[in-house]
Structure formats: C-alpha cells, structure tokens
Amino acid sequence: MRREVFEDNYEAVYKYIRYLTNDQELTHDLLQETFYRFYHKNYTEYERTYLLKIARNLVYDHYRRKKIIGFFQLNSEPIAKEGLPEEIIERNAEIEKLYGALQKIKWNYREVVILRYIEEYSVKETAMILNCSEVKVKNNTARGLKVLRELLGGEKDV
C-alpha cells in the first residue's frame, strides 16, 4: 500500500515542491518529509490532495524559518523538446516569459495558477489543497490569469 501510494504520487509531489522552491536538494528533503508525515497520519482518502497539502505547509514552514519572502522561481530548464529547432527555441522562450511573469504576481494567485494549469487539478481539489473555498479558488484563478495576461501583453493563450 505505501509503495503504491509513493509510486502513484511521487512525480506530482516532486514537481509541485520543485516549482515552489527551484532547489533540487531542498525539494528532495521536503519530499522525504512529506511522505514521512503522510505515512504517520494514516490518510486513506484523497492521498494526493493530502500529500500536496503537507508539501505546501512544509515549503511555507521552511521559508518562514528562513524569513524569505518572494521565494517562488520556476525551473528555467527548457521544457519543449519536440519539433523543429526554431519551434523549440520559440516555445522555450514563451515558457520562460510565462515563468518570469508568474514570479511577478501575488503568491496566492501564483499558487492557484500552478495547481490549476500546471498541475491540472480541479477547482475542488485545489480548494482542498489550499484549505479554502471553491469560490476563492475561482476568484484567485481569474485574477491571476488577468494579471498574467497584462504582464504578457494581453496574450489570450494564458
């Protein structure tokens, strides 16, 4: 059971922590602590939701202790790997531009946009992870996307 939970959720939790920290070593430390805490609480439902909630709290706690504000920086490694070289370069430039814009928006908007559009969670799942209402998730998503569009010059594809 534990191995199955780990294998089913490792990648999603890893990516989430990595997006929040942009630090591979810290990501591995927090990932280990996330699964440790999860296993000691014996959650049986909504495993991924609880894992992400634990991970989020660990990231917050880490930066609160360090007194670091504005710590969000996405990994700038190229993501697009398929297509013609010109297309790959163009797509990677767009991704870096988007990540740069994400760094400039409020944390609560940033986190909702990451969960909804990068991690592809539903409104309900996002609300459970963030411990807030679905209405707040919808409002922050709309506001976050609006700010991103403004930062990216009104692009509709955000």
Q: Which role does the model predict for each range below?
A:
Residues 112-116:
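A short pre-motif secondary-structure segment
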Residues 56-74, 91:
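Arg/Lys-rich amphipathic alpha helix in sigma70-family domain 2
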Residues 1-15, 19, 25-28, 104, ...:
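A short, charge-rich alpha-helical start-of-domain segment used by transcription regulators
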Residues 13, 17, 51, 55-63:
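Hydrophobic-face residues of short alpha-helical interaction/recognition segments
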Residues 128-154:
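DNA-recognition helix of helix-turn-helix
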Residues 25, 124, 135:
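Residues within helix-turn-helix
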Residues 29-36, 45-57:
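Structural recognition of an alpha-helix C-terminal capping motif at a helix-to-coil junction
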Residues 77-103:
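Acidic, proline/glycine-rich intrinsically disordered inter-domain spacer in sigma factors
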